[in-house]
Amino acid sequence: MTRAVIFDMDGLLTDSERIGVSGIQACGRLQGLDIPEAFILQTLGATSAHSGALYRANFPGIDVVRLFEDFRVYMHGKAERGEIPLKKGALALLDALDARGVPCAVASSSMRETVRLYLDKAGVLGRFAAVVTGGGRLPSKPAPDIFLEAARHLGVMPAHCLALEDSANGVRAGRAAGMRVGMVPDLIPFSPALAPYCDFVADDLSRVIPLL
């Protein structure tokens, strides 16, 4: 029985990953860099510390601090203008969880300021009992720490939690946390390699409701 649901944010609750890919590429061009989409997809679900190390290893001379600050300004501007919408089915699933009295949390590798801004501007921040973020304090997904911390805040054993994710790093983190895991793919499609980490795959968040 699902006693709590823990959501990733980017690409799962909010349609921010698609916007973020073009954003990081635009910010890279400010430094004369052409950052391939395929590389950016490898960083999805990772903390800024972890993804920053990947950028430094692959783009010698890059100013990662500047890149991430330019990106933060770009994305926060989008959020403030209401240009980062919720993903399809998000409200329907949150309504279903409310109706059943199932608490939910957000477990995101993004910075806390960013997570709270996106959720607030999307009108759903108050619907989560806990918001747990990476931001360098906790190990990056696929480590389970962010999910485990969210479960602790909810007071629910990990085995009774459903982790919802859209990325490879995310589903691995949910499985490592000992949770039931559902994947709702966004930019990264489901593949057989991810099957060991997923209990089910859904086309959008509303399709999760009958699987609770």
Enumerate the language-model features and the residues they cover.
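Active-site neighborhood of HAD-like aspartate-dependent phosphohydrolases
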Residues: 1-42
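Asp-based, Mg2+/Mn2+-dependent phosphohydrolase catalytic module
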Residues: 1-3, 95-98, 111-212
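Conserved SAM-binding loop
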Residues: 13, 86, 104-107, 163-164
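Short beta->alpha linker loops
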Residues: 19, 46-47, 85-89, 110, ...
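Helix-loop "lid/cap" segments that line or gate small-molecule binding pockets
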Residues: 27-28, 47-61, 118, 150-151
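Metal-dependent phosphoesterase signature
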Residues: 54-92, 100
